[in-house]
Design a protein with these regions (language model features):
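FAD-site-proximal beta/loop scaffold in flavoenzymes
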Residues: 224-254, 373-506, 527, 532, ...
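A conserved beta-strand/loop element that lines the FAD pocket in flavoprotein oxidoreductases
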Residues: 159-171, 328-343
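Beta1-alpha1 glycine-rich phosphate/pyrophosphate-binding loop at the start
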Residues: 44-50, 54, 58-67, 71-72, ...
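C-terminal, flexible cofactor-proximal segment of oxidoreductases
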Residues: 43-85, 95, 505-640
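N-terminal plastid-targeting presequences
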Residues: 31-99, 103-110, 116-119, 147-150, ...
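Rossmann-like dinucleotide-binding core of oxidoreductases
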Residues: 259-335, 491-510, 514-523, 528-529, ...
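N-terminal chloroplast transit peptides
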Residues: 1-25
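FAD-binding core/adjacent interface of flavoenzyme oxidoreductases
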Residues: 46-74, 83-90, 95, 160-264, ...
Length: 640
């Protein structure tokens, strides 16, 4: 796959500028290359491609290393002790203790790649399996089955220990985690309440990948009355609710108004989750209702409520327009510029929709219409919020990234920067500095410098949490606040989380000292270091002491990178399913767009990518089989 991407990049470099679409150029137009030769050359695209090629080559070599590690792991037939905490606390084992919290995209990528021969690896999560979250919408209507998009965490790395439990507290200073063993609900398989034992787990390095939860945005009634689509249990609940609505609407003695209300499904949020659920649900209604409930066809309707002016704001404008047209052609009622005021019950939602004057969207005259929708189900896909443990950590850690427009001023009477302090007792030059994504320190009042993001752990370019003892706590995925080289905040997507997890695993496998200090140096003894309130250091990149000491073999293994490269996110594009065999596919490599497709071609790309990105051959086969089964026999609407 890496070679294919490199080939695509080289082919893309041949024209001066790529064509967006063959339909854009009139038939009689002169050749594109001749038209562009008169324009001045812009060096920035070439520089972007050079950086992208460098990243692609690096990722390709990384993949080769990972393959050798996997082959060695397959050949290893050793069996670890059944009591993983006993082995974890074994003082005679010289390997560092690596604690991984979570079982999402970041944690799964990390566990799959990390070398468990170098670390005592322990994964803790209330969920014992990984979920391919982009296909949760498909599983909620029976297009694919739940088990086809899940993989046990233990299967990702047999040498890594796993505990199904909840981390109730995490102290980054003492490096201690309070773990309650058992799933998040505290229930056994028979549904009985069970108070799981709590243990104190000490670690040397912790990777925090706990993700996020669905956000209600403090709107009354959302938590009590809405369905979500964040976990597998959410997809199961949606599937049961939709199937139950069809059965109830087909019962005798109901009025047309009652049937129409029961079969009106409201989806809040016009991002990828909301749009894909609308597409899958419209497919389900066409398939199931026309096949098994023909009299209910006139009553079924999907309503999409979105606060913005366009759905799927992450995509190109032309693709956003195509998405809106496709949804409406599928009989999805799209309500733009509409915000939810409250949710009174599972059958009643109150909105306010923006209405512009005669001048359209640019008109200064704006009014709000209050609307009430009667429905049978409300699915909430309007954003996410931090997990409870993340909020606790954010409050506990020192805030090392105050807002850029309110920096602390240094004490002008002090002759030594190390002696100047602000009201909190911290050195003001610490607040006046900030890491950029390329590992450089710049002034905090510079344009585009990252600042703290509410509800997320701020990390440096090597994904170390700022405010914790350096190199002991890292954060990846949705729970982290990480910035790209241009100073923009990386999105909370599976693509970002998976790349971060793989990056941290390779950082650990290569033996970098995450503290970045000279060998044997104490944190406070490093010259010029920036310290937080706890004396924790945030200055130097991870370094290989063996390579610094002149170990040629280690230097070659690191490809000359004595100091670790900062994390670089490689954006490969966006995908979204719209229903009816149509999808959006925005394919890119870094900042360089390769193609943008909608309709059946986009659908083919969407399915191809999702099959390739499955985490195991088992899930890859099951997803293909489910698609074939649905095509031949339709979706299963059993209420279970």
């Amino acid at each position: 796959m890496t070679l294919a991407l490199v080939a695509a990049v080289i082919l893309h470099l041949l024209p001066v500028q790529p064509l967006r679409s063959s339909r854009v150029v009139p038939r009689g137009s002169p050749p594109h290359r001749l038209m562009m030769c008169k324009q001045e050359a812009d060096p920035q695209p070439a520089l972007d491609w050079i950086r992208t090629l460098d990243t692609l080559i690096t990722r390709g070599l990384d993949t080769v290393e990972d393959a050798f590690l996997l082959a060695r792991r397959v050949a290893d037939k050793s069996v670890d002790p059944i009591d993983c905490l006993e082995a974890w606390e074994d003082a005679t084992d010289p390997r560092p203790r690596l604690l991984i919290i979570g079982s999402g995209w970041g944690a799964h990528a990390l566990v799959k790649i990390v070398d468990a021969d170098l670390f005592r690896c322990l994964v803790i999560s209330p969920r014992s399996y990984f979920v391919f979250t982009p296909m949760l919408a498909a599983s909620s209507v029976g297009t694919v089955e739940y088990r086809s998009i899940t993989e046990p965490m233990r299967a990702s790395n047999p040498r890594a220990a796993f505990i199904q439990g909840v981390v109730e507290d995490l102290d980054p200073i003492t490096r201690r985690a309070a773990v309650c063993i058992g799933d998040a609900d505290g229930k056994e398989a028979d549904g009985k309440e069970e108070e799981g034992p709590c243990r104190q787990v000490y670690y040397d390095i912790c990777v925090y990948a706990a993700g996020v939860r669905s956000s209600a945005s403090n709107i009354p009634g959302v938590i009590e009355h809405c369905k979500f689509l964040k976990e597998l249990s959410d997809a199961q609940a949606l599937r049961r609710s939709v199937a139950s609505a069809l059965e109830r609407a087909s019962a005798p003695g109901l009025s047309e108004e009652e049937r129409r209300r029961m079969l009106t499904f409201v989806v809040v949020g016009g991002g990828p989750t909301g749009v894909e659920y609308c597409g899958e649900l419209s497919d389900f209604l066409v398939d199931a209702v026309q096949r098994l409930y023909p009299p209910l066809v006139p009553y079924a309707q999907v309503v999409l409520v979105h606060s913005g002016a366009e759905v799927l704001p992450q995509f190109d404008p032309l693709l956003r327009k195509r998405a809106l047209e496709t949804l409406r052609a599928r009989r999805v009622k799209v309500m733009l510029n509409a915000r939810v005021s409250r949710v009174d019950s599972p059958q009643r939602i109150v909105l306010k929709q923006k209405r512009f004057g005669d001048g359209g969207a640019g008109s200064a005259e704006v009014t709000w219409d209050v609307l009430e929708l009667q429905c049978g189900l409300i699915m909430w896909a309007a954003g996410t919020g931090p997990a409870a443990l993340t909020e606790t950590l954010v409050r506990r850690l020192v805030d090392c990234t105050r807002t850029a427009d309110e920096p602390d001023e240094p004490d002008e009477t002090s002759t030594s920067p190390s002696e100047a302090t602000d009201e909190s007792g911290l050195r003001p030059e610490f607040w006046a500095r900030q890491w950029t994504a390329n590992g450089q320190v710049v002034a905090s009042n510079a344009v585009g410098v990252p600042t703290a993001t509410p509800g997320r752990l701020t990390v440096d370019p090597w994904l170390r949490v700022r405010g914790a003892p350096v190199g002991t706590l890292l954060a990846i995925g949705d729970a982290s606040s990480c910035y790209s080289a241009d100073g923009s905040l990386l999105p909370q997507t599976a693509q970002v989380a998976a790349q971060q997890g793989a990056y941290v695993a390779r950082l650990l496998n290569r033996g970098y000292d995450l503290s970045g200090l000279p060998q044997g140096a104490a944190p406070s003894s490093s010259p010029g270091a920036m310290l937080d309130e706890s004396g924790c250091e945030l200055a130097a990149p991870p370094v290989s002491h063996a390579a610094v000491a002149g170990d040629l073999q280690r230097t070659l293994a690191l490809r000359g990178a004595v100091e670790a490269r900062p994390f670089a996110f490689l954006n490969l594009g966006l995908l979204a399913y719209l229903g009816g065999g149509e999808a959006l596919s925005q394919v890119q490599v870094g900042n360089n767009r390769l193609l943008s497709e909608a309709g059946s071609v986009g659908f083919l790309l969407w399915r191809s990518v999702y099959v390739v990105k499955q985490v195991s051959p088992r899930t890859r086969f099951l997803v293909l089989f489910d698609w074939l089964k649905t095509k031949l026999f339709g979706r299963d609407i059993t209420d279970w």
